[in-house]
Amino acid sequence: MKNKSRYFLAELLGSCFLVMIIVGSGLMAENLTNDVAVMLIANTIATGAGLFVLITVFADVSGAHFNPFVSIAMTITGKLKKKLLPFYIIAQLVGCLIGVGLAN
């Protein structure tokens, strides 16, 4: 059970931070300029950099999926045990909801 809680926490935090980065950088980009192209570039760079850091931090703990469809694909390909899939999906969804709430 100890490992399951580590996986759960890693996916929850990673998903939460990823959504906070995406939403937060989008909100900041809107305040940066009126040029939509510049907004998209700023949001993309921030999201890519944030995702790189999150994958670096959480890859060794949970695989850094941060997305239910990635976890499902990993289960189908045999890289994630079926019994862990519900923990991953719940953690990711809860993390995303918390992240949106904190970013707004």
Predicted features, each with a name:
Residues 1-104:
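Membrane-interface helix-loop junctions and terminal tails of multi-pass membrane proteins
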